[in-house]
Curated annotation (Swiss-Prot):
GO MF, any single term: structural constituent of ribosome
Region named Disordered: 47-77
Pfam family, one: Ribosomal_L4
One GO biological process term: translation
Quaternary organization: Part of the 50S ribosomal subunit.
Protein name per Swiss-Prot or TrEMBL: Large ribosomal subunit protein uL4
Lineage: Bacteria, Thermotogati, Thermotogota, Thermotogae, Thermotogales
Keywords: Ribonucleoprotein, Ribosomal protein, RNA-binding, rRNA-binding
Length: 221
């Protein structure tokens, strides 16, 4: 079992926490993490970009000028791609961007990302963070106590409930800070609010609550 220090919201070391090695201490697989992120970013694309071809823009029904004897280059339509206001050649059209990754690879990618953060000493475990009401100042104070001020920090909460929801709202207005819920880790599907590889690797520090660690080990262990 891997061990890490346990802190409270005042930044005080109050003990240690044992982490499952099969979840937090495996050899990170760079290839699988890349595949997961590629899938996640691809599936987040709207696919709504659209342009008109020469057959879809208005006008251009007749030949601009006769073929010969003008001294100018021959032209067939004022809506050809090389004309101003003409159609677009090989432009984007609405399409579905979708990639799959099997559940085994998703699990491995998440465990690799978590293990990488622990290996780099960028994983912080806090006993609990709960606010009676949303307040940005309170969360800033917690981050300051933990020595995480002015850093890109990902905070993962164990579940959706009002006191944790207040923490999530409190983090909205702090640059570089993102708060997710571990209730829906991106194993069965990539959830915007759930724990995922991209957000883990896109932030310098990963903050987990004790309840979050239990939830992650329950799903990935």
């Amino acid at each position: 079992m891997a061990k890490v220090d346990l802190f409270n919201i005042k930044g005080e070391n109050i003990g240690t926490v044992e982490l499952k090695e099969e979840v937090f201490a495996i050899e990170p697989n760079q290839d699988v993490m890349w595949r997961y992120i590629d899938m996640q970013l691809t599936n987040s694309r709207a696919g709504t970009a659209s342009t008109k071809t020469r057959g879809e823009v208005s006008g251009g029904g007749r030949k601009p000028w006769i073929q010969k004897h003008t001294g100018r280059a021959r032209q067939g339509s004022i809506r050809a791609p090389h004309w101003r206001h003409g159609g677009v050649a090989h432009g984007p059209k609405p399409r579905v961007y979708f990639k799959r990754l099997n559940k085994k690879m998703k699990r491995l990618a998440l465990k690799s990302a978590l293990s990488l953060r622990l290996k780099e000493n960028n994983l912080v475990v806090v006993d609990d963070i709960k606010f009676e009401k949303p307040r940005t100042k309170d969360l800033r104070e917690v981050l300051k106590n933990l020595g995480l001020e002015n850093q890109k920090v990902l905070i993962v909460l164990p579940k959706k409930e009002s006191e944790y929801e207040n923490v999530k709202i409190s983090g909205r207005n702090i640059p570089g800070v993102k708060v997710l819920i571990a209730d829906n880790p991106g194993v069965d599907r990539v959830n915007i609010d759930g724990l995922n590889v991209y957000d883990i690797l896109n932030h310098d520090k990963l903050v987990l609550l004790q309840g979050t660690v239990q939830k992650i080990e329950e799903v990935l262990g």
